[in-house]
Structures are given as structure tokens and as C-alpha cells.
Swiss-Prot record:
This is Conotoxin ArMKLT2-0112. The keyword Transmembrane does not apply. Residues 23-40 form a propeptide. The modification Pyrrolidone carboxylic acid is found at residue 41. It comes from Conus arenatus. The lineage of its organism: Eukaryota, Metazoa, Spiralia, Lophotrochozoa, Mollusca. Disulfide bonds join 42-56, 49-60, 55-67. One of its GO terms (cellular component) is extracellular region.
């Protein structure tokens, strides 16, 4: 009985390790996508923006849709 429990736990542990390894491969691809987003050029002051992280200055006034200096 104890041996059966140990074997079941070992199989579950190994299965979990394989699933984790499989997720890491996908995570590496997502990381590459994130890095490509980080290498995009930012919008200069006065340019159009919809989010603060689009602007080189990191400041966007959404009401007018323009990047501003901070």
C-alpha cells in the first residue's frame, strides 16, 4: 500500500515537472513578444498618444491625445 502511494506521488510529481517545462517554452515566446514591444520607438513630445507608455516622456494627456514633457 505504501509503495503504491509512493509510486503515485512520484508519477504525479514527474507529470507536474513536465507540464511546468512545457509552460516555460511558451513563456519564452511570450517574453520575446514582450521584448519586441519594448523595442518599439516611442512617440515624441507633441505626438499622438492614447497611453502614457507610448510617449518618450512617459506623459500622455489623454483628453487631447498628445504626449507632453514632464
Amino acid at each position: 500500500m505504501k509503495l503504491t502511494c509512493v509510486l503515485i506521488i512520484a508519477v504525479l510529481f514527474l507529470t507536474a515537472c513536465q507540464l511546468t517545462t512545457g509552460e516555460q517554452k511558451d513563456h519564452a515566446l511570450r517574453s520575446t513578444d514582450k521584448n519586441s514591444k519594448l523595442t518599439r520607438q516611442c512617440t515624441p513630445v507633441g505626438g499622438y498618444c492614447s497611453r502614457h507608455y507610448h510617449c518618450c516622456s512617459n506623459h500622455c494627456i489623454k483628453s487631447i491625445g498628445r504626449c507632453v514633457a514632464h
